[in-house]
Amino acid sequence: HGAAVLMCEQPRASCSTAGVVYLPLEECLEQADVILTIGGDGTILHEANLSLRYAKPILGINLGRCGFLATCEVSEMEAKLSAVARGEFSVDNRMLLYVRVLGHDGWEGHALNDVVVTKGRLQQAIDFSIYCDDILVEHYRGDGVIVATPTGSTAYSLAAGGPILDSQTKGVV
């Protein structure tokens, strides 16, 4: 189809395919039109920040056990890649959480699935203040908190008794 295949240099030793251009990861992501992941949902979750940083859609080829996000099966890969090369695809935009955890082990970033903050090995409960758009939502004391996007509502949040949200819902659990 005339599309160039770019691959980051890291897996080069395990993949030697004619016609593939190997580049440093940053350069590969800058030049690519689509990020192709081969694995399962965990692989997509791992690459979601790259997708966000470079404003590139992800096409997930499912090799894992769970394919909620990696919806393309290996048997469909050739047809899907041909469709992408022809520009015949749609992008399913998903909600992301921007998270800032303050305190001793502070963290800042984006989450496609969920954010889980727990007391860890501490024997006592911890205090939480949860803000949304810089507005205090709740302050409480407990073992931890899970905040999940609609995408993440089928993961840890569901296992903890939370509801399943439609992927296009504009809200969090």
Where are these regions (language model features)?
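Short glycine-rich anion-binding loops that position phosphate/pyrophosphate groups of nucleotides
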Residues: 41-43, 66, 151-153
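Short hydrophobic core segments
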Residues: 35-37, 115, 145-149
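Short glycine-/acidic-enriched loop or helix-start segments at secondary-structure transitions
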Residues: 17, 46-49, 70, 127, ...
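Gly/Ser/Thr-rich active-site loops/lids in small-molecule metabolic enzymes
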Residues: 135, 139-173
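Catalytic core of DAGKc-family lipid kinases
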Residues: 66-143
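ATP/NTP phosphate-donor binding region
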Residues: 1-34, 75-90, 101-109
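Gly/Ser-rich helix-loop-strand patches that form or flank binding pockets
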Residues: 50-61
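N-terminal glycine-rich "phosphate-gripper" loop used for MgATP/nucleotide binding
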Residues: 37-41, 48-50
